Amino acid sequence: MEPRTRILLLLGLGWYSAQASLLEVLRTELERNAAVLKTQPQPAYFLAYQVTDLQNTVLEAQAGKLRSVSQQRTRWLDVDVRVGSYELDNTHPLQEASDWGFRSYPVRLPLRDDERALRQLLWQATMSAYDEAAESYAKVLAGRSVRVQETEGVPDFSRETARRDIQLKAHLQLDTALWAQRLRMLSALFAPHPWIYSHRVRLQVSSTQKFLVNTEGTELAWSEQFVFLSISAQTRADDGMELPLYRTYFAFRAEELPPMEQVRTDILQLIELLRQLRQAPVLETYAGPAILSGEAAGVFFHEILGHRLEGHRQKDPNSAQMLRDLLGKPILPPFLDVVFDPTQRFRDGVPLAGSYLYDDEGVPGQRVVAVEAGVLRNFLLNRTPIPGFAHSNGHGRRQPGLKPVARQSNLLVFARERVSPEELRERLRQECRRQGKEFGLLFASVEGGFTFTARTVPNAFNVMPLVVYKIYVDGRPDELVRGVDFIGTPLTAFANIVAAGSDVGVFNGLCGAESGNIPVSASSPSLLVSRIEVQKKAKSDERPPILPAPLVEPFR
């Protein structure tokens, strides 16, 4: 099949020509090296080069002063070699392989397109990658002769349409003097509060250009850009419990971040909330009804559903494969749909961090309806086929130095039946009365979470709330509480979702897993859960500092 071709010129001719020369070197060396490797006793049937040109600018401020400014540009080469065939190759999962070959051993490249240096580094990296692939393939052949195969007949690599496309953007430029002034102003807001023991205002501007060629004929160059403005502050209660709060703003360009006056107002509200948390009572162990805000519900789905939908886990013999046999069966209430869509850049005007044009295997990002009317329909797939799914749907992602695996993008939860926030609270009270509870809980904000998917440990999750309120049945004002984590097991948690609100919250952040840290988003309406469990959060025995904090000069 002829490669699909598209070229979009977004840059000056000189800059474009320089980048084209990099692609030319990659293509030339790919063809030269592949011609040799396919004639070896253990032939390589696939070879790919990916270059990631990353420019990162980070500014940090504290107490009205600029703490650090750094700008770094690096180029990384990842070489992917496959020995064997599409049906069986060196990446075949082995029961005893703890990392399933996730490392890629990246090579740092010069920033300038020095053809001789590039060719030398490509040659060295290709030989190293081939030697490792050939060794792994020998282990695969030996292992198959003595072990039961769980995924017999499922190929190790999918055949995909080759594509040629150039859609590059110049690296983002930042007015560092302007943003240094802004960060100093924002961080100075914490100075009058000595009970805030640490704080930070951080701006990260990340601009990435990716170049990918492979022996199937794919030749791609595209850009990914994002900006995070992060606010963090921490205090400590009298009993020693550490109390952090965070506020993060995401945009595709720095000028698209919220106005500084809005950020200033948000910081003042965060400071007041920290003050209230220091005095808030500790919530005892609780099991009962709760509302998850849209942001909290997004993290909830990311942890307990999203990671279990990642396709390679359905083939990994060390994974619990909890959802593998539930395809076509209900796993959520019939009023909920769950979609993953890297092509959607905004939801209700809010930018989404998990957006991209192509994944790291050269497959276009695609909208995936994972759950439809509560029924499991699909998994997130890279080019590792699983039973019933022969092709990638554009979710093979990685950070440089690691092998691409199926990862999340923009997780979107949709509710077919919605009620107003007021009605959702009233339904919470009704559920509390039915269960004989004095109050229910509202999880307003969360820090993040983690989950376990291996067979050797309980398949549980832990979502770490930052802001939790008691909602009383008798109508008393909501009460702020602290000191708990939201825990549970996936299928039970799914079954307890009983209603959804009409609002939508968005969580943007970085997700870490086998293939590294990647930007993702999770968005959802608020959810009413008939029964959740919380456990006490780990607590330090340290008391608040004896010495008063030094006075900080006001910002000028």
What are these regions (language model features)?
Residues 377-431:
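C-terminal, non-catalytic macromolecule-binding modules
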Residues 367-368, 377-378, 409-410, 439-440, ...:
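Conserved active-site beta-strand-loop modules that form the wall/rim of enzyme catalytic pockets
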Residues 414-492, 508-514:
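Hydrophobic alpha-helical bundle architecture
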Residues 285, 363-365, 404-408, 436-438, ...:
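Short gly/pro-enriched beta-turn/loop segments at secondary-structure junctions
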Residues 11, 15-358, 363-367, 372-375, ...:
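Active-site bordering "gate/hinge" segments
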Residues 245-247, 381, 482-483:
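Short clusters of small/polar residues that mark proteolytic maturation junctions
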Residues 2-10:
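Sec-dependent signal peptide recognition
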